[in-house]
């Protein structure tokens, strides 16, 4: 899996006023947990853009004044009005412990139903996955090359190697729906067949 490096600094002052001052200085307060102790830190807001505003999933290398931590983005809080990042939580990861992440789904192939005029609907964009860090996939490929109009692919059709998908097996991932034009064409063809 791809990794993004975040450079941060340990926080000396904790509390609302200190956090507010950090945000005014375009810094984002955060907490690293999952290791021996919680580490409070802050990082420039601009550094977080590639991690937060993307559909991709990443591992994070957190560099706190020379100390390196491998982690993942666990939680993020946004301002309710202007979508500014208010706070981030990072979870430290270890090679011998499984982690849970939301991994994006990538549709692979061309659905014959789309060629016939159907509409491909991507029902799920991400799935929660549990795996050891070395086995965590960048994306979950889903083959749609066999989907005709009215057919769908489900979570149960995904071949997961070395990871577990946390979703109901019957959950639809992608479906080729009938469009109005396709229904109208079918009704028109049926009407012509009855007139003969």
Curated annotation (Swiss-Prot):
Keywords attached to this entry: Ribonucleoprotein, Ribosomal protein, RNA-binding, rRNA-binding
Signal sequence region: none
Gene Ontology BP term (one): translation
Family: Belongs to the bacterial ribosomal protein bL25 family. CTC subfamily.
Matching HAMAP family: Ribosomal_bL25_CTC
Function statement: This is one of the proteins that binds to the 5S RNA in the ribosome where it forms part of the central protuberance.
Protein name (Swiss-Prot/TrEMBL): Large ribosomal subunit protein bL25
């Amino acid at each position: 899996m791809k990794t993004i490096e975040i450079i941060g600094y340990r926080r000396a002052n904790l509390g609302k006023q200190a956090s507010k001052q950090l945000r005014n200085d375009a810094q984002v307060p955060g907490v690293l947990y999952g290791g021996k102790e919680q580490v409070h830190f802050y990082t420039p807001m601009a550094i977080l853009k590639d991690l937060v505003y993307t559909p991709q999933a990443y591992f994070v290398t957190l560099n706190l004044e020379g100390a390196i931590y491998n982690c993942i983005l666990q939680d993020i809080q946004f301002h309710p009005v202007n979508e500014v990042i208010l706070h981030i939580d990072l979870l430290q990861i270890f090679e011998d412990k499984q982690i849970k992440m939301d991994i994006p789904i990538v549709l692979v192939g061309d659905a014959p139903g789309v060629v016939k005029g159907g509409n491909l609907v991507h029902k799920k964009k991400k799935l929660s996955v549990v795996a050891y860090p070395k086995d965590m996939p960048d994306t979950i490929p889903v083959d749609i090359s066999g989907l005709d109009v009215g057919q769908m692919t489900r979570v149960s059709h995904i071949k997961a190697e070395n990871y577990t998908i946390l979703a109901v097996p019957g959950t639809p991932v992608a479906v080729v729906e009938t469009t109005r034009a396709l229904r109208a064409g079918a009704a028109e063809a049926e009407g012509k067949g009855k007139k003969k």
